[in-house]
Amino acid sequence: MRRPFFHFASALLACLFLTQCGSIPVGGGGARTKRLEKMGYESVPLGKIAGDKRYSGFFLVNGTPLQFLVDSGANRTDVDEALAEKTGLRIDHSVRIVTRGALGREIHSGRGFGSLQIGSMISPDFPFTIAPRGGVKTSTSSYAGQVGLDALSATGALVDIPTGKMWVPGPNSTQGLGRAGLRLGVRPDLGNKALRLETAGRLPHLILKGTLNGRPVSWVVDTGAEVSVMAAESFDSFNIPSRNTNSRMIDASGDRIPLRHARLYNLTFGEVNISVFDISIAPLGPVRKYFHDGSGRPVDGILGMDFLTTGSALLDSGSGFLYMGEPR
C-alpha cells in the first residue's frame, strides 16, 4: 500500500488570551456604519463568552452554526477535531500542518474541506485547519475554533471591533452582485485616516509600521488579542519604566507567561499620533523570529483590541488597510 505524503506547513498563531484584564469599552455606530450600509454591506453581530473579553461569532460550517473567535492574528481558520467530524468536513489525510503558539510550542494539525458561511457570504470549499483534541486550556479552547485571515479574505469580511460587528458584502452590494472582487481597495470615506498594512514577509499576517520616540517600530494587528503586547526584547531597548503584574498571557498552545505593564508616549502611525498608550510586555522571541516588516526588522509587538477600540478602527484585511477614527 502506498504511504501517504505528509506536507508540513509552518505558521505562527499570535492569538492571545489574557487573564485578570480590565473591561474594554465598546463604541457605537455613526457615519461609518451608514456608509457601509449604503454600500450594501450587512452587519454580522459578534458577542463575548463569559470570562473572555474577545469577540466571537456564530458562523455556519456545512450548515451547522459554530462559535468562532475572530482572530486576525491567525493566518488560517481552524476547527476542533470533534466538530470537524460532526459537521462532515472532508479530511485530507495527505496533509499535516505544523503551527506554533505565540510562545513557540508546536501544534500538529490536519486539513479538512467544507463550506463556511459568514452572514450571506459563502465560501463553498473552504480549507479548514483541524485542531487536535487536547486537555490543556488554550487561547481558543472555549470555541469551536478561530476565524483567521483566510476566512476574512474568502468572504470579504471587515472587522469592526469598536462596535462588536463584522461587515460582509450583502446580496445587493457591488461585490455580492459579482460586479467586483471582494477586495474594496482603499476607501478614505471609511475612516478619518487610512493606514496601509503590509504583510510579514512570506506570511500573510498584517503589519502596521510606525515610530516610538522617533524610532521605527512595527506591530502585528491582532483582533484575537485582548490587549496589546510589546516584545520584551524590543521594549527593554527603549529604557522605559515598567512594573510587574498578576496577568498572564495564554497562547494557542496553552503556554502561559507573566506580563509586565508600561506606558508608552508618542506612538505614531503615519498622521496618527497616540500621545499615551498603555502596553503589556512579554518575551515574544518566536513572534520576532518569524514576523518581519518590509525592511527585514523583527516586529516589536502585537496591537490588540484595546488599540483597535481606542482608535475606533475598522480592519479590512483583504485590502490591507486599517481605518482609524470615524469618517467625517
Q: What are these language model-derived features?
A:
Residues 1-10:
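Bacterial N-terminal signal peptides that target proteins for export
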